[in-house]
Amino acid sequence: MHGNIINIEDVILDLVPQPEIDLRCYEQLDYEQFDSSDEDETDNMRDQQARQAGQEVCYRIEAQCCMCNSIVQLAVQSSRQNVRVLEQMLMEDVSLVCHQCAAQ
């Protein structure tokens, strides 16, 4: 539009049909290169980097306080197998307590 007064002639509506776009993906994956385990992709990358460096990996763990249900965060450095053991313990008979409940 040009000027201070709005005219219908100033509004140009030219609708030009776009060529049809193919939105399908023709990518093919080689499923043999992927294993069917339940591990997260980021865990795999982190483990690969740690194995290459010959180090253990640092994991961040979040769980609820068993007394007040607030979030408790831990950072542990361990192997993947030992973190799985800790995860199993937290799901069964080990509970975490936040610092406020522990002080009472």
From Swiss-Prot:
It comes from Human papillomavirus type 26. This is Protein E7. A zinc finger (unnamed) spans 65-101. Plays a role in viral genome replication by driving entry of quiescent cells into the cell cycle. Stimulation of progression from G1 to S phase allows the virus to efficiently use the cellular DNA replicating machinery to achieve viral genome replication. E7 protein has both transforming and trans-activating activities. Induces the disassembly of the E2F1 transcription factor from RB1, with subsequent transcriptional activation of E2F1-regulated S-phase genes. Interferes with host histone deacetylation mediated by HDAC1 and HDAC2, leading to transcription activation. GO terms for biological process: DNA-templated transcription; symbiont-mediated perturbation of host cell cycle G1/S transition checkpoint; symbiont-mediated suppression of host innate immune response; symbiont-mediated suppression of host type I interferon-mediated signaling pathway. GO terms for molecular function: DNA binding; DNA-binding transcription factor activity; protein domain specific binding; zinc ion binding. Highly phosphorylated. Keywords: Activator, DNA-binding, Early protein, G1/S host cell cycle checkpoint dysregulation by virus, Host cytoplasm, Host nucleus, Host-virus interaction, Inhibition of host innate immune response by virus, Inhibition of host interferon signaling pathway by virus, Interferon antiviral system evasion, Metal-binding, Modulation of host cell cycle by virus, Oncogene, Transcription, Transcription regulation, Viral immunoevasion, Zinc, Zinc-finger. A motif (LXCXE motif) lies at residues 23-27. The keyword Zinc-finger applies. Homodimer. Homooligomer. Interacts with host RB1; this interaction induces dissociation of RB1-E2F1 complex thereby disrupting RB1 activity. Interacts with host EP300; this interaction represses EP300 transcriptional activity. Interacts with protein E2; this interaction inhibits E7 oncogenic activity. Interacts with host TMEM173/STING; this interaction impairs the ability of TMEM173/STING to sense cytosolic DNA and promote the production of type I interferon (IFN-alpha and IFN-beta).
